[in-house]
Amino acid sequence: MRLSPVSLRLSRGPALLALALPLAAALAFSDETLDKVTKSEGYCSRILRAQGTRREGYTEFSLRVEGDPDFYKPGSSYRVTLSAAPPSYFRGFTLIALKENQEGDKEEDHAGTFQIIDEEETQFMSNCPVAVTESTPRRRTRIQVFWIAPPTGTGCVILKASIVQKRIIYFQDEGSLTKKLCEQDPTLDGVTDRPILDCCACGTAKYRLTFYGNWSEKTHPKDYPRRANHWSAIIGGSHSKNYVLWEYGGYASEGVKQVAELGSPVKMEEEIRQQSDEVLTVIKAKAQWPAWQPVNVRAAPSAEFSVDRTRHLMSFLTMMGPSPDWNVGLSAEDLCTKECGWVQKVVQDLIPWDAGTDSGVTYESPNKPTIPQEKIRPLTSLDHPQSPFYDPEGGSITQVARVVIERIARKGEQCNIVPDNVDDIVADLAPEEKDEDDTPETCIYSNWSPWSACSSSTCEKGKRMRQRMLKAQLDLSVPCPDTQDFQPCMGPGCSDEDGSTCTMSEWITWSPCSVSCGMGMRSRERYVKQFPEDGSVCMLPTEETEKCTVNEECSPSSCLVTEWGEWDDCSATCGMGMKKRHRMVKMSPADGSMCKAETSQAEKCMMPECHTIPCLLSPWSEWSDCSVTCGKGMRTRQRMLKSLAELGDCNEDLEQAEKCMLPECPIDCELSEWSQWSECNKSCGKGHMIRTRTIQMEPQFGGVPCPETVQRKKCRTRKCLRSPSVQKLRWREARESRRSEQLREESDGEQFPGCRMRPWTAWSECTKLCGGGIQERYMTVKKRFKSSQFTSCKDKKEIRACNVHPC
């Protein structure tokens, strides 16, 4: 029985991929070929028997992990290839991943996750679900699967392989059929891996980068920003080892800073283009508003780029918005292999990193520049309790995005003689690379049909075709591209395989018997999965019928019914639905009882995949002016709803907002309020008094300068008396002296009419060192006389100016 899932999670402990190759399907070999597979009492038996001597696969067969690493990074994806050197081949195989020094008889002995690449070639074993085996028994020279490395703490993993080549030739585990990988030191996670070898590949390769944003309220519920969540436009490039866009442990450039804080790729693109000698392709893809939507509603953004021998690295980044300065991306991803070829596929799960330019800790923290600037580093779950990724136990952060980089073409003479797979041969045959898919959003198509047989009947270049249907054209003014697609191919006869065979699906279950009693008929169907490569007609049957018996003899209570009618149309026009069929009672039971025969049947039916016509929107308007005339602000743009969706409301955003930055705002001088006027500096005649104010904020960025801080105005008290004679002055002074001496004897404080005062305090310190300040001193009442007719005794205060010289 064939399993449907394309991936299987193994035990949580991180281990490397141990590959073992058992022959699982009974169709693969007869009893004469293999001994019976005995059932193990352990978790997964990997027993494979063949007649003859077991041999070591040192030369003919090899098990290889792409890039030939000695270490694995937990959670990363690795392509694993099992191949035979020509003219050798194999028919049966099994792959399995075991922790080091484990036998595989318990579930916890296994580690990592397998992912099926081609279901026509590989599948999970029905009696050993952690192992991968062949889908159909046939001659082959290579198979490939992905292995997702286990979590941190698993240790080393052994990849093991077992194969059966012919009836009596059997290989397992030894030599080049094993591969040991150990867990990468976690202390190296914070440093970007740098290429250490020069690239030796020839020609150029073209890749497609596809970005899948998985950041949503479901995956990251804490403080998720519902209104403004988005990914900024992707910006990056393919470049040489002499240029670094960004890296862990390095400092963000101004371009990286503007992507991280504002989501603007303009400065970053300018920086990349300035390195024209080191850059081959600038990578750009549109922003995503909101951050996550199902792929059947919005296609994942993608971009194509090329690499060559000197510019074989690629880097990119995109801002996670809103956020202080958080991004995801790849840095210096090497697409060149040690075998002088080009990597076929890279799959990486991404966690956010901090650009080191803003110190905010939540999605919508206010701007708080980091001074001095810090180094780029990955975010962790222990950064801050208010962080949306905080975990007091220090667990790993759930990935927020996944990037897939796939090779789609190669041009020029290639160095590696053996291609990665048949698709690579076809890609090399292509006279020119295809442009990026520019299908308008207003054109709704069905899925592509399978490829036809190759037009060449010999081992020569030919063409094959596939088709799709135009289901809807939402805007008649926008033409829809062709509904046919052609691709180069190689005709049959290029391998040892029989090109005249066709691949069939499994038989579906038998239909119900056509009668409710006695002898009837039933049928089952299958379909052609792959037509013969030589272009011949597939002669294998697609329908079978056989006799069936129900209750053998019809009793007197049995009734006679008609044949089943045709099935009704499916209740759904797309996706899953129900269909019914009916039959009639031709003759009721002879004993007069009710006919118990079934007269209607219902079963599920599957129509083509649903392609809901989306709501039609106008293009985005131009961005509005910044909300401020200086400093940091916001700007917006809008679009209009032209028509509703086919099924329900339109959930697309009609307005977008982003940060904008203008020159710093001028800061005017700020002053305190004026002080009280001081007392007149003359006790009689004309004088002046002053008041002061202090500077609280100096002017900046061209702001209004500070005005005066000291003001003077004239004052006039009583007229001064004419100068008395010298004799009168002496007499008055003597009288005043005697009076003062008398008062000092009566009281230790100064006396005013009706009260006795304490002496003046010392002058306070000046409020400013320059620019005009003030000083104060006080005199307080010590005693009021009851017999006094004066009731105006009050504390007194004097103010005078000080340090009035300019600063």
UniProtKB/Swiss-Prot annotation:
InterPro entries: Reeler_dom, Reeler_sf, Spondin/Thrombospondin_T1, Spondin_N, Spondin_N_sf, TSP1_rpt, TSP1_rpt_sf, TSP1_spondin_dom. It comes from the Eukaryota. This is Spondin-1. Glycans are attached at residues 214, 681. Binds to the central extracellular domain of APP and inhibits beta-secretase cleavage of APP. NCBIfam families: NF038123_dom. It comes from Mus musculus (Mouse). Residues 1-28 form the signal peptide. Residues 195-388 form the Spondin domain. The lineage of its organism: Eukaryota, Metazoa, Chordata, Craniata, Vertebrata. Its main location: secreted. Disulfide bonds join 44-128, 156-182, 199-336, 200-340, 202-415, 443-480, 454-489, 459-494, 502-538, 513-517, 548-554, 559-595, 570-574, 605-610, 615-650, 626-630, 660-665. Residues 732-752 are annotated as: Disordered. Residues 29-194 form the Reelin domain. PROSITE patterns: REELIN, SPONDIN, TSP1. Ca(2+) binds at residues 325, 354, 358. One of its GO terms (molecular function) is LBD domain binding. Cell adhesion protein that promotes the attachment of spinal cord and sensory neuron cells and the outgrowth of neurites in vitro. May contribute to the growth and guidance of axons in both the spinal cord and the PNS. Gene3D superfamilies: F-spondin domain (2.60.40.2130), Reeler domain (2.60.40.4060), Thrombospondin type-1 (TSP1) repeat (2.20.100.10).
